[in-house]
């Protein structure tokens, strides 16, 4: 049974029905429509916490999807799952792939920075200050890119950049 038929949430189900109608009416090819169905089912599974099913659907969507922006969104969602499962290196790799498809994804950069900053704190707590500084610098690098793409969208990151002395004046313009 398609995932859309199992969704009990009225708003989600309404959205799914509307999206399905739009996809049926739009003049897009069958391959793109099928990719969308896999993506939609992956998103639904991800929202339900069924990450294995979500990843399976996202993998199928990637096999069919040709649009780089849509591929990037699918990869970003996969990376979010890897990140939440503690597969941080795999998440970083997948965020990079998403950015190759669409470099205008500040949320990918933000999430990569969260991982680097976490690794920096772990290294710092372990007394490895040089390693910590390298991770913090990597976090600052990707976060600076994220802030440039989305000025004012990540105030917590802007504050971290300023408070750690890793801020550039031009970041905010």
Swiss-Prot record:
Write down the InterPro entries for this protein, in alphabetical order: PSI_Ycf3_assembly, TPR-like_helical_dom_sf, TPR_rpt, Ycf3/AcsC/BcsC/TPR_MFPF
Gene designation per UniProt: ycf3
Q: Which organism is it from?
A: Synechococcus sp. (strain CC9605)
Q: Where are the TPR repeats?
A: 35-68, 72-105, 120-153
Extract one GO BP annotation from the record: photosynthesis
UniProt keyword terms in alphabetical order: Membrane, Photosynthesis, Repeat, Thylakoid, TPR repeat
Q: What protein does this entry describe?
A: Photosystem I assembly protein Ycf3
GO annotations of cellular component type: plasma membrane-derived thylakoid membrane
**Which coarse location class applies to the principal site listed for this UniProt protein?**
membrane
Function of the protein: Essential for the assembly of the photosystem I (PSI) complex. May act as a chaperone-like factor to guide the assembly of the PSI subunits.
NCBIfam families in the record? PRK02603.1 (NF002725)
Q: How does this protein lie in the membrane?
A: Peripheral membrane protein
- Would I find S-adenosyl-L-methionine among this entry's keywords? no
Q: Which family does it belong to?
A: Belongs to the Ycf3 family.
Q: Where in the cell is it found?
A: Cellular thylakoid membrane
